[in-house]
Amino acid sequence: MAFEEMIKKALDESRNNCRLGDTLEEVQEIQNYIKNAEKIYIPNKNGIKVDVLNKVLREYNLPSAKILQINTNEADSNRSPAFAKAIMALDVCDADLIIARGRLGLPGSGSLLLFVDNKGRILTCGTSPSHAISQKTLEDAVYELSLIHI
């Protein structure tokens, strides 16, 4: 099943009150979308997250992501800063895939790593607790979170 057809089918099921949850086929379509992405961007103002995410992308034989050097501080005033970063990136580049990481919500709420398609739809994501609790370095937190979702 093609990616867009899979989305339409799931929406039709929801509309018709017969959706029973995600299927393995849907998960595989999302994985295929990620694996077939050619233009991958990471909105960030420094390269630390980009270096770590590119290490993971290489481990899965995926193309390297490019840093999209935009000031994402404004995203922190949003209710969902990580998603706001992804949308900011889509507004300024022609990407197949955006990988954005930022605060989950309120200060202290933890971090959210998002994989977003070229239409701003969340493909997958992962959360991690605040660094104040986990005591993990930025590099370790990003690496561990991204491994799970590719």
What is each model feature region?
Residues 71-94:
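Short, solvent-exposed, polar/charged sequence segments at loop or secondary-structure edges
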Residues 105-131:
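Amphipathic beta-strand/beta-sheet edge segments enriched in Tyr/Trp
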Residues 55-65:
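Short helix-loop-beta junction
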Residues 36-56:
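N-terminal beta1-alpha1 ligand-phosphate binding loop
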Residues 20-35:
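A short, basic/flexible loop-to-alpha-helix module at the beginning of a structural domain
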Residues 1-20:
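Helix-enriched interaction subdomains in cytosolic or periplasmic regions
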Residues 148-150:
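Conserved small/polar residues in nucleotide/adenosyl-binding loops
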Residues 90-106:
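A short, hydrophobic beta-strand-centered structural micro-motif
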